[in-house]
Amino acid sequence: MVRKAGKWMALGLTVTLLLTGCGNVQVKEAVTESEAEIQVETVEDIAPESSQETAEESTEESEEEVAMSTNPKQVVVYFANWNLNEKPADAGGEVASIPWDSVSYVNHAFWAVVPADGSTETSTERRNNGEEARTEFKIVSTDPKNDYEDTTPSAIDPSMARNHFAEYAAYSEKYPDVNIMLSIGGWSRCGYFSEMAYTQEGRNSFVQSCMEVLQEYPWIDGIDIDWEYPGGSKDGERKPEGDDDQGCPIFGTVQEDDANFALLLSDLRTALDENFGAGVKKLTACASASTAWTLPCQDWAAAEPYLDMINIMTYDLAGTWDGVTGHAGSVTGAKNAAVYLVMKDIPAEKLCIGSPMYAMALQMKSIPSGTVVGTAIESYKPTDHEIDEEELSGYIADAVSGYTIKQDGLRYVMDEEFDQGTAGWHMGYDKNNGAAYLYNDDESSSYYKWYLSYEDALSLQGKLDYIQEKDLAGIIVWESSLDLPTHEYIRQMGDQLLGESL
């Protein structure tokens, strides 16, 4: 990383320093020029002529060449515990369905923080009533039956029970080099993190509970903290979005919350090393990818020394909140977040960027005559269900215009463009930002005016190339069951990042 003319050239992006508010706190924030300036440069896209876009070209390489990576790379897949009775065993329902030979980490989602005494008073209620923080907490499964109670034989291997922990125990022996992590939190289960971390006693109780679980299940290789997010965002603390969402209240001040996050990680790191040996158990944490909204509210430089990796959730970067169509998980979005954290003195080799195995679905208000990305959208999504890669493959197969992809060695590259000249699904690819999208202009279709931002082999290839070139730690996936039935994308990751280590 070099400094030139008051700007930082790092990881292939130019960033500038701005002051921005974080709740009621002013903090230094690194903002990419693509966020700070109006987007005006032409993008060379693969799309129908009517859908050429304009956007900031923010993927230009740094003036300094960076050597190809030398550090081991990681493929981290999240596995959702609620899928056991919602999906077929071999399609994400059971742990056995994970492509174990293509991953290096499996993060089990989720466990949660709860008051140890069983009280149901929320942290928000307790804080607003002027009560002191509780001091006894523990971690519990969000689905005990699926995790360890269900003794029904596995549909894949009837010799073992189908509950997740029984299968993890078996697969940890078969794949000893794969780290199985217990992920605590998640978007809807962050309601007690802040109150727990507010006092030393609360942190001690949480850490002790983690140690007890790791001792009971020795195949668990570490803890992944998915607190979304300490210190909140520029909007302040996150409010619940539904009956099943705890939100993420802040107990105390924004500054205290942020400091307590680092203290919690320090306590966890110390306990892990003392109980299991230095570096034996892993400790990771999830970070937002929003460089202008959420990341400024967390002091990752204070947290980093205690972590093996920081998993940047570089997805959901576009949505109804923008008012226009955009890219939810582009290569540029991943680069922006990585650059931001490197500027905060986070080692690049500790950073994982994210790959979403689902589409962000938006409803355009009308079919544009020109630009598609940046088109006005409705305030609602056209569907509530999660569109996985298998469903997307059907829309792609029906596309009336777009492009094909081929393999060149291990890498995936664009092959041929096509255009049937009719209405229907149209595939587009933003070369400058590394992002795939679909939209439908067939008035007779139930998908009329739909816009889908998604990951394909090309955008994923851009991320894998960036990881190798800039020596990042690797890639995270939300989540393994959303990939194609053949796990095509996870295998693309494993083949290129893990290679002979598989």
What are these regions (language model features)?
Residues 106, 182, 225, 268, ...:
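Conserved, mostly hydrophobic/aromatic
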Residues 198-226, 260, 264-272, 294-306:
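An active-site-proximal structural segment forming one wall of the substrate-binding cleft
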Residues 74, 80, 253-295, 350-356:
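Aromatic-lined carbohydrate-recognition surfaces of secreted/lumenal glycan-active proteins
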Residues 64-214, 241, 245, 326-327, ...:
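Glycan-recognition patch characteristic of GH18 chitinases/ENGases
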Residues 114-147, 151, 357-466, 496-497:
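Glycan-binding loop/region signatures in secreted carbohydrate-active enzymes
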Residues 99-104, 108-118, 221-223, 227-229, ...:
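Aromatic- and acid-rich polysaccharide-binding/catalytic face
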Residues 18-37:
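Sec-dependent signal peptide cleavage junction
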Residues 210-255, 312-316:
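Active-site groove signature of glycoside hydrolases
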